[in-house]
Amino acid sequence: MSTIIDIHAREILDSRGNPTVEVDVTLESGAFGRAAVPSGASTGAHEAVEKRDGDKSRYMGKGVLEAVAAVNGEIAEMLVGFDATEQVGIDRTMIEMDGTPNKGRLGANAILGVSLAVAKAAAEFTNQPLFRYVGGSSARVLPVPMMNIINGGEHADNPIDIQEFMIMPVAAQNVREAIRMGSEVFHTLKKELAAGGFNTGIGDEGGFAPNISSTREALDYILRSIEKAGYKPGEDIYLALDCASTEYFKGGKYEMKGEGKSLTSAENVDYLAALCADYPIISIEDGCAEDDWEGWKLLTDKLGAKVQLVGDDLFVTNPKRLEQGIKAGVANSMLVKVNQIGSLTETLMAVDMAHRARYTNVMSHRSGETEDATIADLAVATNCGQIKTGSLSRSDRLAKYNQLIRIEEMLGEVAEYAGRSILKV
């Protein structure tokens, strides 16, 4: 009854109007799973390959018909007849079919779409929500949201070098309250920016994208908004940054054009340390570039005992890259993006490896998202305690927050909000 009888993919659009892959999986019992694959703007060089057609006459070369054809042809022919509850076997079969180290032949977007849709169909077959099917009976921790309320870098058309300025409402009693706190700060920030003469247009992830050129000015606006919303910075709500520094690491220097700075690795570490000394920043993602291992070591030695140092481009949710980082003693946290590695099984392996090394995990969206809320379920399934899924606007971001509210309600009294447990200080 849990046998796969049909796999069908189609080309749909993501939140930036670019094509992406959506996959439907149907089982003999009638159980059904659907998954849409996200896409990143700032992508790591070591990520699995997102297959694009390259046909400039369609979607400016960004079509995904080849990935769709791979699902509807080769992958479907192989997997129809498989038991959907055999997730590991299904994922391994697709990886072996692809035969490349980076899923470049079939495309990570093809493989991941099938992988997640299979898990959803199996969850429906077993009459369980996805978080329970993947995480088992111990899945009960609701994550602290990292809410991206000012966008810069590749996510916005403004001069800010740092890509994301986030708030983390650790003092909330539950995820509903955390989302409310974030919403109140977001709307207060809008008023503050407007009063300062800045535009309040939003970036890819729903945060504001004002023409602020200084990192400190952006942080000051956020602190003021937290206070005016009735909360205490560094007590109720902390700050987090995603530098996405690979994007401005050129010729061995950190070229921060908005700030007018050209920094060596050591100077970049000092720059970040000074920000942490002056502001209640508890998490920095990609503070150094993906291949600046020396810089990462300096950063970890300087800040690792008191600040969460998240590897995104550094680790790309890849167990091999993570193992290299653990051995080198760099970073202390991994950002988890399912499409960076390209299958549910490999994602869970990487999360487990990080957990065993006492690294934290942060479940994450991509800048190109859809209404698919799978990552909310995966955040709870893995008990990772943190989720990064954008701001308090755009339905593609709110879909994940709303799903967390539903999951918390479903869990009832056994639900736990991670809250202050994530703090390193």
Curated annotation (Swiss-Prot):
Keyword Transcription regulation: no
Superkingdom classification of source: Bacteria
Keywords noted in UniProt: Cytoplasm, Glycolysis, Lyase, Magnesium, Metal-binding, Secreted
Sequence positions that bind Mg(2+): 242, 285, 312
Biological process, per Gene Ontology: glycolytic process
Binding site for (2R)-2-phosphoglycerate: 163, 337, 366-367, 388
Listed GO CC annotations: cell surface; extracellular region; phosphopyruvate hydratase complex
Reactions accelerated catalytically: (2R)-2-phosphoglycerate = phosphoenolpyruvate + H2O
Gene3D superfamilies xref list: Enolase-like C-terminal domain (3.20.20.120), Enolase-like, N-terminal domain (3.30.390.10)
Active-site annotation: 205 (proton donor), 337 (proton acceptor)
Uppermost EC category: lyase
Pathway assignment: Carbohydrate degradation; glycolysis; pyruvate from D-glyceraldehyde 3-phosphate: step 4/5
SUPFAM superfamilies listed in its UniProt record: Enolase C-terminal domain-like, Enolase N-terminal domain-like
Subcellular location field: Cytoplasm; Secreted; Cell surface
Entries under CDD domains matching the protein: enolase (cd03313)
PANTHER family, per database record: ENOLASE (PTHR11902:SF1)
Xref: HAMAP family: Enolase
Function: Catalyzes the reversible conversion of 2-phosphoglycerate (2-PG) into phosphoenolpyruvate (PEP). It is essential for the degradation of carbohydrates via glycolysis.
Similarity comment: family membership: Belongs to the enolase family.
Protein name: Enolase
Organism of provenance: Cereibacter sphaeroides (strain ATCC 17023 / DSM 158 / JCM 6121 / CCUG 31486 / LMG 2827 / NBRC 12203 / NCIMB 8253 / ATH 2.4.1.)
